[in-house]
Amino acid sequence: MEYGDIKFLVRKSLNKEESLNIRLKIKDVNLREIQLYKGKTKIKNIKCKEDFYCDSNFIYIKNKSRDFILEYEVLIGSLGKHGKGGEIGEDLISFMGEQILLLPVEMLTMSDDLKLNCSLEIDFTKLIEDLNSEDDYKSIIPFKENDFKSKCIGATWSDLYEIMKSSYTFGFFEEVVLKKEYGEVHLYYSIENEFLNTINKEELIRNIKSICEYYYDLFKIDFLNKKDLNIVLLRKSKNENSYILGGSGKNLISATFDMNKKRDWQLLSHRIFHSFMDHVLKSRVYHLPPNLWLTEGLATYYENLALESLEKELKERLDIKFKKEMAILYTRYLYMTLKEPSRFKIIPMEEGSIRSHGKIEFLHYTKAPLLVYFLETLNNSCGNKNEIIEYLINNKEKSFSMQNLFYNLLGFQCDSFASKYLFGNSIIPLWDLKEYLDNKDVICTLKEYEYILWTWFIGEEENYIEDDLREYNKKIEEIISCRNINIYNAYLTKQIEDYSKELSFLLKAWIIRSNVCNVSSQDENIRYKLLKDKVNLRIWNEFLEQSIKNKVNI
């Protein structure tokens, strides 16, 4: 690497309430051109004595100096899918490394076995002096050198990933040590956390400890491979009254948490899984397509399976059941894959060519965990639900290969499985999950999913429309009962009907609607044409009125 020591000096910005001023200094630069990755920084007011220009992802600098200096400001607190991305206040500061740090591209893409021959320091001293100087103001940061300074010497790619993904959190916290064997787990919670009281605090501590112990066992952590973890439970944002996501790294997780919400337990479990996987499997290869879908699929699979370790009373109160969560995911998968095949028949091993954020979200958090579940059930004669992760751990010193993984797990079935589900669009056959599906909740569950999909796609598709499933009522049910409607073919129709009457009803209603409006099921714009196009809306409404009035069949 053609760089010397790197230092970030972080201060409070004078321009906006939740902005930070960053001064980056890189010593002994031996390059004439420097390329810094902007990533998720909301950057503005860049100052540099060297010539530079920017595009959407990078800052390009024509460097002439031995010691390079760049000053810039970043905005903290943008709203995302899990809440507000950080917060800056007097009692709490929390944000993710990648929200404030600009690093050279060569560092972020270096090989797993390389180490930087320099130090990387982040100094928050001035920031804390500007906002709060009380003695009991805690700092929870990675690579902690002192209270308000982070310093990593000889960083590997895994260390840089931790620096970028981790939370940097400061504030007033209570602290509990959950575990000391094979590494320490520290739990911090905001003193002003409205979700905690003296009644449920002990229950919270016991159950978070149970999840951590589950992952210590799963990843085979022992005295030769110790693992530390800091979990910070934040209060809600005072300004927006929304959740705060501070960051999620290898050793430090920070987010708002309500122990009475199942989704919060799932997200915490998901983040703890990533923490352990990043600790044990340090290679960059697991974070790149076409392998990333497997990593996220495992995280979503285990976010639910690990919750089986919670206390019985808490699981009953929050309706936490692993197979039921898999059934909900499978229902979502069937619904969207069959409703919009041109959008959602996504091939996992083509992950690297997918440009749509919404499609990636669907692959990672709906389809991928089902593929993991399917794989674990194919050869599950001995009841082992962990064959994939055990293979990865046992072969962590070897170069990772999807082909080797699947041949090891499936043997002679591998080629057939790969052609159908990894390189093809065959429907994943998990029909037995119907046993765990509550049919009366299907429409409500899918209505929630329609909203989630809308949040995924609206940023890239201005005309993406959320389908209001409340409009599919008894009138349409009467029309469906008069017709023999196939969901693509007779076999699939029978499977769907047996799996869920409500799912079958919704899919058949969509098929009737597309037929009436003469829109192909393969049309890439089918959602807009059926739900927004004024001519088709009129045709559909007239059809409903006429069908009920005359009881005619179409």
Model-assigned labels for residue ranges:
Residues 1-29, 37, 41-49, 71-73, ...:
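Beta/coil-rich, acidic/histidine-enriched accessory regions frequently appended to metallopeptidases
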Residues 24, 215, 293, 298, ...:
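Active-site-proximal alpha-helical
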Residues 224-227, 284-286, 309-320, 324, ...:
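Acidic/polar loop patches that form or flank catalytic/metal-binding clefts of enzymes
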Residues 252-338:
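Zinc-dependent metallopeptidase catalytic helix centered on the HExxH motif
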Residues 3-5, 9-10, 21-28, 37-39, ...:
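Extended, low-hydrophobicity, Ser/Thr/Pro/Gly-biased non-transmembrane segments
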Residues 34:
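Ligand-binding face of N-terminal immunoglobulin V-set domains in extracellular IgSF glycoproteins
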Residues 176-291:
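Juxtacatalytic substrate-recognition/specificity segment
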Residues 125-127, 213-225, 305-313, 380-382:
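Secondary-structure boundary elements
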